[in-house]
């Protein structure tokens, strides 16, 4: 299944706010999550919608998300918590959380077009897994810095997650630690996502 490139507002009406996909918010009364034909959502549909919310927020294909779920399932600790940590530590998401891009698709473009360096080296893989003490910067070219500055100027100045530090004058971000679950940038019940996949096997 390919990555979603359709109307974004349609998705947030169905699933609620998806800040990684779009900065838009559903209008009051336009949220379709509780408006099913039967008047009551099944447990399957609730789990499916949580899975879709995670997938569209982080801009993943179905295959990519399934791979992350499998990796998380083999790791120590809560599968749901490990899954969120894996997704949050992706380079495209780190750029988004730093405010260097207004959306995760926008961050992905910056990476694909080789505007981003990690520890002084160009990284053009959006799924690159960042680690504590990684330093995220832009290339020294004027065009690269202009793109980042445009994002910084247009993005709402929200409180930065505690696992990150950003020096806007230097276009430099620092990953301080693995993210704590309370700083996840999405309202999600990750256990329902894990349950969804466990029932598919």
Curated annotation (Swiss-Prot):
Q: Which PANTHER family match?
A: 30S 40S RIBOSOMAL PROTEIN, SMALL RIBOSOMAL SUBUNIT PROTEIN US4M
Q: What are the TM regions of this chain, as residue ranges?
A: none
Q: What is its main location?
A: plastid
Q: Which GO terms describe its cellular component?
A: chloroplast; small ribosomal subunit
What is the name of this protein? Small ribosomal subunit protein uS4c
Checking PROSITE patterns in the record gives: RIBOSOMAL_S4 (PS00632), S4 (PS50889)
Q: Which Pfam families match?
A: Ribosomal_S4, S4
* Domain S4 RNA-binding span(s) in chain numbering: 89-150
Task: Look up the record and give one Gene Ontology term from the biological process aspect.
Answer: ribosomal small subunit biogenesis
**Lineage top rank: taxon:** Eukaryota
Q: Which GO terms describe its molecular function?
A: rRNA binding; structural constituent of ribosome
Record flagged with keyword Hydrolase? no
Which NCBIfam families does its entry note?
PRK05327.1, rpsD_bact
Q: How does it assemble?
A: Part of the 30S ribosomal subunit. Contacts protein S5. The interaction surface between S4 and S5 is involved in control of translational fidelity.
What does the function comment of this entry state?
One of the primary rRNA binding proteins, it binds directly to 16S rRNA where it nucleates assembly of the body of the 30S subunit.
Keywords, comma-separated and alphabetical: Chloroplast, Plastid, Ribonucleoprotein, Ribosomal protein, RNA-binding, rRNA-binding
Sequence similarity: Belongs to the universal ribosomal protein uS4 family.
Provide the species name: Liriodendron tulipifera
> Residues annotated as region Disordered?
15-43
Q: Which residues form a coiled coil?
A: none
Q: Where is the signal peptide?
A: none
Which compartments is it annotated to reside in?
Answer: Plastid, Chloroplast
